[in-house]
């Protein structure tokens, strides 16, 4: 009002000065300045309250989360229990709701910036599932061997796991009753660890076709996590396989192990045990490291599928005689994993010690594919006893001898593996004063059994 006072002074000294016009002009300037400030404050408050109103509406009608397993934002209606991804269609639907129901107009970019922020808490749905399972008292730690043993608690303390195991009749029943709980506990341990792979074995069911092997293995993923399992073929050399490992609780390899060559089989063993996997999500710029989430299972029609003659400690094969699939479907997998969680907490040893690993090697022999080298070695040679005469032959000499009777291509490496597996004695000898060479104590079966085969083919 300082300008108004000055105008009064001017009026006193100049009687002909018109006060009204000047005073109105001054008041108008001050009013305009006030309106500008009001508009600025209003715009500042409106911008803030608009996003707050959007968040209030979204929180009232929906629940949002950022799925750390799938690396995406998800939401569900407050009245519906199923989470779905937030994509372009969902964003446009939410924009339409805000406009129609709340008269709030906003851009897709702004809506994305709200939802893909701390507004949506980061959640690992699989770990959340296991943490939410009820606590079960299975007895004291000594009942399950503590950390120095792997004895499964009696049926008085466990129910769901023994019931599930009893649905399957296998040829090696005692090992099935021990190894299935080990594998189930390892599933829980592996899912709860973001830095290491805790399940180093693949549970494999072999046998005749139509025995519900694949169906039973699919049941091992609980219904609450049905979206986190993969059943089908995998190719160790492809990048999609790494995504399967990082985004699924169970990977079920369906009748493919027989078709794997030795290189792929070795790659698969590495994939089963790798601590982390690296891959790039669609539309992301960078390759990132992800926890190894998956536990492996597989089904095989027939029994022979292992191509490595030295055996494998990564596979737990069982020949199926029958499966009561209807009874298996009726068993609550929530109860099964609640018991597995309790076993893990009690200190149950879900890993395999040295003696058990040696036993795995022995038991895997029944599931190995017999190579041509092994077949010919068993047909044409034998191990000498202490009082029998024998020859000292190199691998090359053995292959040369067999080449007289068969045109089948044979590999020195596979013959060496066959000799080792069959238990032939390997020794170092010098011939004619030359360098030492490796030879095997061996006896030829005479006449050579291949002669009859060659004669019958002529």
Q: Where are these predicted regions, by residue range?
A:
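N-terminal nucleic-acid engagement/recognition segments and initiation subdomains in replication
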Residues: 1-156, 170, 174, 178, ...
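P-loop NTPase catalytic core of nucleic-acid-dependent motor ATPases
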Residues: 119-246
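AAA+/SF3 P-loop NTPase mechanochemical coupling elements
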Residues: 241-246, 281-299
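Conserved AAA+/SF3 P-loop NTPase catalytic/coupling segment centered on the Walker-B
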Residues: 249-272, 306-311
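Conserved catalytic/switch belt of AAA+ P-loop NTPases
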Residues: 265-288
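A short helix-turn-beta junction within AAA+ P-loop NTPase domains corresponding to the substrate/partner-engaging
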Residues: 306-324
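Long, low-complexity, charged/polar intrinsically disordered regions in eukaryotic proteins
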Residues: 331-363
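DNA transaction DNA-binding modules
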Residues: 351-458
């Amino acid at each position: 009002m300082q300008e108004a006072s000055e105008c009064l002074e001017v009026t006193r000294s100049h009687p002909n000065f018109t006060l009204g016009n000047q005073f109105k002009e001054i008041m108008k300037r001050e009013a305009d300045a006030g309106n500008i400030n009001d508009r600025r404050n209003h715009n500042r408050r409106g911008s803030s309250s608009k996003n707050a109103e959007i968040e209030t509406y979204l929180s009232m009608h929906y629940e949002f989360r950022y799925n750390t397993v799938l690396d995406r934002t998800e939401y569900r209606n407050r009245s519906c229990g199923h989470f779905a991804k937030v994509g372009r269609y969902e964003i446009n639907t939410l924009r339409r709701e805000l406009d129609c129901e709340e008269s709030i107009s906003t851009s897709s970019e702004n809506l994305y910036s709200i939802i893909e922020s701390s507004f949506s808490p980061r959640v690992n749905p699989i770990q959340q599932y296991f943490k939410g399972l009820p606590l079960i008292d299975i007895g004291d730690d000594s009942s399950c061997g503590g950390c120095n043993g792997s004895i499964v608690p009696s049926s008085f303390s466990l129910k769901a796991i023994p019931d599930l195991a009893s649905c399957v009749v296998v040829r090696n029943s005692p090992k099935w009753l021990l190894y299935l709980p080990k594998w189930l506990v390892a599933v829980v341990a592996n899912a709860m660890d973001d830095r290491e792979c805790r399940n180093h074995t693949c549970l494999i069911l072999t046998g005749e076709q139509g025995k519900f092997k694949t169906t039973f293995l699919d049941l091992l993923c609980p219904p609450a996590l049905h979206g986190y399992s993969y059943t089908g073929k995998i190719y160790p050399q492809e990048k999609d396989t790494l995504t399967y490992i990082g985004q699924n609780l169970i990977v079920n390899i369906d009748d493919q192990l027989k078709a794997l060559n030795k290189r792929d089989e070795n790659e698969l063993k590495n994939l089963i045990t790798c601590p982390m996997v690296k891959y790039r999500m669609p539309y992301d710029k960078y390759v990132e490291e992800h926890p190894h989430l998956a536990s492996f299972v597989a089904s095989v029609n027939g029994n022979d599928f292992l191509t490595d003659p030295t055996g494998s400690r990564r596979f737990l094969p069982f020949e199926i005689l029958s499966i009561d699939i209807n009874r298996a479907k009726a068993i609550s997998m929530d109860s099964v994993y609640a018991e597995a969680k309790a076993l893990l907490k009690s200190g149950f040893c879900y890993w395999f010690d040295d003696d058990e690993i040696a036993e795995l090697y022995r038991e895997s022999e029944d599931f190995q594919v017999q190579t041509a080298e092994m077949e010919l070695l068993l047909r044409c040679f034998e191990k000498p006893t202490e009082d029998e005469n024998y020859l000292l032959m190199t691998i090359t000499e053995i292959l040369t001898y067999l080449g007289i009777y068969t045109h089948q291509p044979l590999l020195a490496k596979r013959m060496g593996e066959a000799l080792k597996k069959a238990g032939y004695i390997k020794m170092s000898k010098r011939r004619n004063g030359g360098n030492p060479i490796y030879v095997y104590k061996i006896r030829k079966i005479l006449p050579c059994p291949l002669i009859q085969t060659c004669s019958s083919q002529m």
